[in-house]
Amino acid sequence: MAIVSSSSGRKSPCRETALVDPQPAPEEQVIRPEDSLRPKRLSEYIGQSELKQVLGIAVEAALGRGEALDHVLLYGPPGLGKTTMALVLAEELGVNCRITSAPALERPRDIVGLLVNLQPRDLLFIDEIHRLSRVAEELLYPAMEDRRLDLTVGKGSTARTRTLDLPPFTLVGATTRAGSLSSPLRDRFGLIQRLEFYGQTDLEAIVARTAELVSVDLTFDACARIAASCRGTPRIANRLLRRVRDVASVRQGKGTIDDAMVAEALSLHRVDHRGLDASDRRLLAMLMDQHGGGPVGLETLAAALGEDPVTLETVVEPFLLQQGLLVRTPRGRMVTDAARSHIAEAA
């Protein structure tokens, strides 16, 4: 299976990545099949049992008919394995996987170039698909539905339409904001699946697997503590494990990493036993201390914290909501009794 990555080559603004930020750090955005921690097959993919069952049946049916897999939309919070699942699907289908992201498809020729170079039954993965431009979306409509490209050649009175036939292919789109997709684009996906936060048992299995792959020896309690502190997100679990490994190699050298060493490493990075970092606790503490627990509007909250409202809503809040530490009301955000207890314990 070939993996081809496409990007615009434009540098994004530099920002500090929090240890428990589910967005990928720069070094995590590079896909290296030879040293990747990603599973290769559905049987190796831990968690998301319903998703695996649905996609496994679809893959087996497509292979049995000798057809391309239907188009797939994967959505959910960042860091849960959407890109990994796309690579797994390509491996299961035995086809090439071409990887790009919506911001890289700025001009019509960018997406046209990708589509015309696809081989039969290839898989095209578009990350952040909700950020596609209107022109790119309109090019995808006939490509997804009728396997053709409708191109306009020339301008004004000399303009004419040229149609190019495309081979059967599978588009896998990934997004953290499924509601931002236009209805015409969303309706062209035959399989629409949500990835959920991972449970403790699955996360422990992921941490144990990663530890084995990177030759780190963990006690069961150490593995459990990392799993409990990763916000239900495999990407964060692997990142925490790397930071624990760093601290352990300096503090004790080689040897088994125990629960106490993990606790020391997480404390050093200001990550508590529930996966909250200093920014999360500051948000909850500000709501309680300055606003009596809320409600507080998103814009006000973002301004007080110096955060972008979209980042706050899509990256920070989902985990706090899932943990029952924060609630959204028509009047704004409010802390819960569980949040008050947690902040009191951390004080």
UniProtKB/Swiss-Prot annotation:
Pfam families: AAA_lid_4, RuvB_C, RuvB_N
GO CC annotations, alphabetized: cytoplasm; Holliday junction resolvase complex
Region (Small ATPAse domain (RuvB-S)): 199-270
GO molecular function, one term: ATP binding
Protein name: Holliday junction branch migration complex subunit RuvB
Biased amino acid composition, Polar residues: 1-10
Stretch list, region Disordered: 1-29
Residues noted as binding Mg(2+) in the record, renumbered to the chain: T83
Region listing for Large ATPase domain (RuvB-L), in residue ranges: 13-198
Sites where the protein binds DNA: R328, R333
EC nos: 3.6.4.-
Gene: ruvB
Primary subcellular site in the record, as a coarse category: cytoplasm
GO biological process: DNA recombination; DNA repair
Compartments reported by the entry: Cytoplasm
UniProt organism field: Synechococcus sp. (strain CC9902)
Gene3D superfamilies for the chain: 1.10.8.60, P-loop containing nucleotide triphosphate hydrolases, Winged helix-like DNA-binding domain superfamily/Winged helix DNA-binding domain
Family: Belongs to the RuvB family.
Quaternary context: Homohexamer. Forms an RuvA(8)-RuvB(12)-Holliday junction (HJ) complex. HJ DNA is sandwiched between 2 RuvA tetramers; dsDNA enters through RuvA and exits via RuvB. An RuvB hexamer assembles on each DNA strand where it exits the tetramer. Each RuvB hexamer is contacted by two RuvA subunits (via domain III) on 2 adjacent RuvB subunits; this complex drives branch migration. In the full resolvosome a probable DNA-RuvA(4)-RuvB(12)-RuvC(2) complex forms which resolves the HJ.
Function of the protein: The RuvA-RuvB-RuvC complex processes Holliday junction (HJ) DNA during genetic recombination and DNA repair, while the RuvA-RuvB complex plays an important role in the rescue of blocked DNA replication forks via replication fork reversal (RFR). RuvA specifically binds to HJ cruciform DNA, conferring on it an open structure. The RuvB hexamer acts as an ATP-dependent pump, pulling dsDNA into and through the RuvAB complex. RuvB forms 2 homohexamers on either side of HJ DNA bound by 1 or 2 RuvA tetramers; 4 subunits per hexamer contact DNA at a time.
Keyword field: ATP-binding, Cytoplasm, DNA damage, DNA recombination, DNA repair, DNA-binding, Hydrolase, Nucleotide-binding
Domain of life according to the entry: Bacteria
